[in-house]
Amino acid sequence: MENGSMKNSISFPRLTEMTLIGLTNVKSFYPEKHTLECPSLNVLKVYRCEALKMFSFSPLCCKQPAQVDEIHDMPFQIPLFSIEKVSPNLKDLALCSKDALKILNGGCLENNFQKVEVLRLHHFDETPVTFLNGFHAMFPNVVTLQVRGSSFEILFLSGGIDHINSQSPKKIQNLWLFELEQLRFIWQENFAGDHFVVQDLEGLTVLNCPNLITLVPSSLSLKYLTDLEVNNCKGLIYLITTKTAKSLVQLKRLVIANCEMMLDVVKIDEEKEEEEVIFENLEFMEFFSLSSLGSFCNGKQTFIFPSLLHFVVQGCPQLKIFSSGVTITPFLTGITLRVENRRIRWKDDLNTTIEQLFIEKEVSRSIEK
């Protein structure tokens, strides 16, 4: 504990990471009225600590007066940090809606979070969705954005401040969306393709979003996306359209799991059926527990996978054919059916193998009856 003007702070000069999870009854770090000073702190993550206040803000920045415990003459919630003293070296930060909105509305200096590269937003239950279009002004160097446990129906709206912020120095490279039970759309239709959250996007992970209707609007091009994983999104009927598929020239890894309503991975849009769709760099593809999946695509397009080496299929009982059109996979030599014991099947080509596996399952079902 420090003396003099800093007597109300406790210093941990070498602490680089602080993670607090599920401490529902903890109200303060120290029983007295003291905040922390951690000048070397790089990672600050606080989740599900409802009684704990993370930051104290300047009275000039707070529109509502703080609640006071009249018996002890002190705030009910003793903050961990003074916003003015938070480490300027933070690179990984988790924020709830209350703190995030105060920061966005001028609750701190603009240079407080200049070095933050990973921003984790959680429990935005009553927050206007427009926040997600403006956060980059306070966090200009964020390259990884995580949103979880919130009530958004649409994450990113089109137009307005979105386009202005597309000129920010850093663009989002990774977008992680977890446990967004009310989410219906990630991007609004006609969303600007040069927006900072789309332009350089390399990784997209969407987990436990059961009401998601559309993953990507067909108007968006994801030309830098290399990794796409979608798990437990039960409302998706298809993953992407053929127009979006054509933009995925850098995609290397595709994993789809536990999407029980999905009928096709690629849906035919207005593109001409005879046109080719080339996944130039796709090396790994996995379909797991897709109980309604009938095909990769039910159209006549030619699908070319010049780099595909591994294809894992498990728990897809309705998969009858890979594609109704031509499928070219020059380096694929087998379909992995069970990863744990490396069960691999292959007959002539990808379509023939899928057809043969479906026939065998049908024969097996008839014998069991």
Model-derived regions, located:
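Cross-kingdom leucine-rich repeat
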Residues: 1-369
